[in-house]
Amino acid sequence: MNPERQETISPKNVPFQPVPTPNQQSLQSRMLESNQAVPDAFQKVAAWNHYNAVATPPIGVPQTARPPSNQSPHPNPPGYPYQSHQQQFHPLAIAFQQPFGLPQQVIYPPPPPGFTPHRVQVSPVGLLGPPGFFPQFAGSTTSQGNPSEVSVRTKSAEGTTGPIAPSITTKPTSTIQVAPPRDPVAPTTSSSGITKKPENGEFSLVKTISGHTKSVSVIKFSYCGKYLGTGSADKQIKVWNTVDMTYLQTLASHQLGINDFSWSSNSQFIASASDDTTVKIFDVISGACLRTMRGHTNYVFCCSFNPQSSLIASAGFDETVRVWDFKTGLCVKCIPAHSDPITSISYNHDGNTMATSSYDGCIRVWDAASGSCLKTLVDTDHAPVTFVCFSPNGKYLLSAQLDSSLKLWDPKKAKPLKYYNGHKNKKYCLFANMSVPLGKHIISGSEDGRILVWSIQTKQIVQILEGHTTPVLATDSHPTLNIIASGGLEPDNVIRIWRRN
């Protein structure tokens, strides 16, 4: 065994034990009833995990143990029991995290290249809405796809990635070229107007930005307001200057598409979540990848820095929440949080609690320190929840569901206070935003190519922004200025900047 490869174990006082899948549970029961020893296959799986566990050094220390990027980091060790990666269950998917006295958690590697993960758990009856409904993502046993061509977020819940017929009436009428960016695959920036003159107090399209080669899956302004980050199914995150929307940096290290990313509070780092099952930390200025965190056994769909930027929480299709130490990259907590893929995770303003949403129809609020579940929010329709975030003051939650609705929750009362309707959202996981600088508004994209702005108080639509020709997956509002950024599915994979007059 390579002496540089070491087993990395999370603290033993983590209070949560992962729930085995039905197949695993029945296997454990049969083994205990017959008083048999641990099967040889499980011993080999444990050896495989030990063989691939890598202790990553603190940020700033060279990661000499990592193999070159052009070499496979996961050669089959001697005695590896599963020679085919195309069978139904990969050993990383069936190896439960505390099998028969083994350490509570080993930081597992991602599946070997070319392997398409499969779901192994069955959802509780009735939690996914209408009978027979199930999100048809690439990670599902009912759907196959080429994950290298799209990210999970840009894939429809019905298993299609094609655009939905838009109803667009307003389109750019002029294009002004600006100076080319620095690198040879230069993103280009243009300034555009719209066909009708906007009224005072309304948003208008002021700029379009081209740079990504595939669908734009996530857009977020930095906390300082100086930068705009955009993530895509093309495996890259790009950083732009918000003053003139010129290109600054490309963050490229992931092997598959980007589903989400989070800015650190000082706007110097970005944590990213990808289909390649890893979470990475990037230095925004240099563009260097400082850390790769391995542990998730399926697509990582969402991630979030805590307000202190000392921890990163991530979640995804393995239905667990993992909390990572920013400085060391070690997993300090693993929570089996939901019974279906987790679609978003958010810390409140003080970092004491975090919220998660899932296709199981539940929103859960967690104590960030202990990992205990404080509250479970479920509405009567049980629609799959695709997004959740705390309000700026931390008192409320905003959620998005696959029933074309947004809901404002009071976590203490465990029920929705207000409903926001008017957009179309039946297939994709769309981001939504609460904007105080813009006048206490809620902003969301729509699958018909529009962006809707609601009044938080009155629930009325105050403006509809038209310009995209495909579903708008990602929106965000500037922390201090009256600016909205939006992006959507290819072929209309450009970023649009909207400003209020």
Swiss-Prot record:
Keyword Cell wall biogenesis/degradation recorded: no
A single GO molecular function term of this UniProt record: microtubule plus-end binding
Disruption phenotype: RNAi-mediated knockdown does not result in detectable defects in histone H3 'Lys-4' di- or tri-methylation in embryos or adults germ cells at 20 or 25 degrees Celsius.
SMART domains found in the cross-reference section: WD40
InterPro entries: G-protein_beta_WD-40_rep, WD40/YVTN_repeat-like_dom_sf, WD40_repeat_CS, WD40_repeat_dom_sf, WD40_rpt
Annotated spans, Disordered: 1-35, 58-85, 155-197
Statement: the UniProt record of this protein carries the keyword Repeat: yes
Keywords assigned: Repeat, WD repeat
Function noted in UniProt: Not required for methylation of histone H3 'Lys-4'.
The name this protein goes by in its record: WD repeat-containing protein wdr-5.3
Originating species: Caenorhabditis elegans
Gene: wdr-5.3
